Structures are given as structure tokens and as C-alpha cells.
């Protein structure tokens, strides 16, 4: 595990970020984020990450060189627009926070309604039970056919939550993610499309 990744996780932890937000920011699973925030100092002192069993293996994805550039993001959005050529829809819903820039560019390119879904992991409240919500232009997608956009899908939980919420007010037709780590092709009858997919290959000597 890279020292840089451990340092980033610890920095975000010290800034008050919960494990869910750290996982999204670093494109790792919540389980890995929790492991790093709890054991990061010891890992740095040891000089290397101890060998872990296969259940703790995770893949770290970094695409800062793309998402930091509006021009490069627009090029990615054009690829997704091309993949949407056979899909009839009225609106684009970006999952906060990683999916919002892409959803904005896609809706602009195709002249579609735009909205944001804020997952419950980003809702900071003292209530035990909380839900996500539509954060912008809800009226523009009610009763409409929509697509869902996110940057990275790790466990699929945020996408599943978004689909469940939207099915109560709209008709989610497809989900588009840049990078898929989950290997999931469909959630609740909604197809998941990806630009790139990662996986772990167990090579035995």
C-alpha cells in the first residue's frame, strides 16, 4: 500500500472527514478507509504495509490528472454521451460529489435537465435514521426518464441508494460510471455501464 495513500487518509481523518467521505475522496472501499485511519500511524512506522488476507485487498484508483481539468473531464463526458446515443431520457442525475461535474457536462452537451442526488453518507445529522435527497432541480426530473452518473463505483451502495430514491419520483434508465470496482452489471433492474472496470486476479505460483 502506498505511503502517499496512507498519508492522505490520515490527513482527511484529522480534518474531520468520516470514513465514508475518505473512501470516496480516495476511491477506496469504506473498509479500507477505516483500516487506514485506525492503523495508519503504525503502518508508517513499520515502513511497509503488513501482508493482509485476500478479504482486505483493495485497489486504489487515482484519476486526479483528469478530474482536475475541465477540458479532460469534458472529453470523458463526450465518451459517455456517445454511449448514450441509443438511450431516450429527459434528465441527468449526478451522485454527489464525484458524479456532479460529469453530470453537469453531460446535461450541457445533450441539453438535458440536471439534478444532484446527495447520498445519506454525506448528510451530517444527529438523527439515527437519515436518508439522501435531491439537492437541486428536483422538479425537473419528477416523473421523467433519467440517467445516473458517478465517477467511481466501489461497493455499489451509493448507486443502489440513488436508484431506490429515484424510483419513487422518476424512472432511472441507466447508470454510467467512469470506473467500476464492484463488477456489478445491474442493480434493481437498472443497467450499470462503465468506461473502465478493475478487478483482482489471484495468481498462484
From Swiss-Prot:
Record key words, sorted: DNA-binding, Transcription, Transcription regulation
Family annotation (InterPro entries): GfcR-like, PRibTrfase_dom, PRTase-like
Record keyword Cell cycle present: no
Any Pfam family: Pribosyltran
KW Oxidoreductase (keyword) present: no
An example molecular function term from Gene Ontology annotations: DNA binding
BP terms from Gene Ontology: pyrimidine nucleobase biosynthetic process; regulation of gene expression; UMP biosynthetic process
Domain of life: Archaea
Domain notes: Contains an N-terminal DNA-binding winged helix-turn-helix domain and a C-terminal regulatory domain (or effector binding domain) resembling phosphoribosyltransferase (PRT) domain.
Family: Belongs to the purine/pyrimidine phosphoribosyltransferase family. GfcR subfamily.
HAMAP family: GfcR
NCBIfam families according to UniProt: PRK02277.1
Protein name: Transcriptional regulator GfcR
Lineage: Archaea, Methanobacteriati, Methanobacteriota, Methanomada group, Methanococci
Amino acid at each position: 500500500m502506498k505511503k502517499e495513500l496512507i498519508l492522505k487518509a490520515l490527513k482527511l481523518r484529522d480534518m474531520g472527514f468520516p470514513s465514508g467521505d475518505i473512501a470516496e475522496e480516495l476511491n477506496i472501499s469504506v473498509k479500507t478507509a477505516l483500516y487506514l485511519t485506525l492503523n495508519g500511524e503504525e503502518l508508517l512506522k513499520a515502513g511497509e504495509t503488513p501482508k493482509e488476507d485476500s478479504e482486505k485487498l483493495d485497489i486504489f484508483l487515482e484519476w486526479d490528472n483528469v478530474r482536475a481539468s475541465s477540458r479532460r473531464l469534458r472529453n470523458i463526458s463526450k465518451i459517455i454521451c456517445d454511449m448514450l446515443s441509443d438511450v431516450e431520457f429527459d434528465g441527468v442525475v449526478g451522485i454527489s460529489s464525484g458524479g456532479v461535474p460529469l453530470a453537469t457536462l453531460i446535461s450541457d452537451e445533450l441539453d438535458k435537465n440536471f439534478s444532484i442526488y446527495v447520498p445519506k453518507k454525506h448528510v451530517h445529522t444527529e438523527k439515527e435514521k437519515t436518508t439522501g435527497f435531491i439537492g437541486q432541480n428536483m422538479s425537473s426530473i419528477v416523473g421523467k426518464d433519467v440517467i445516473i452518473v458517478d465517477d467511481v463505483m466501489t461497493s455499489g451502495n451509493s448507486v443502489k441508494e440513488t436508484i431506490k430514491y429515484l424510483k419513487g419520483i422518476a424512472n432511472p434508465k441507466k447508470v454510467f460510471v467512469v470506473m467500476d470496482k464492484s463488477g456489478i452489471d445491474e442493480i434493481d433492474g437498472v443497467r450499470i455501464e462503465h468506461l473502465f472496470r478493475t478487478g483482482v486476479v489471484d495468481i498462484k505460483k
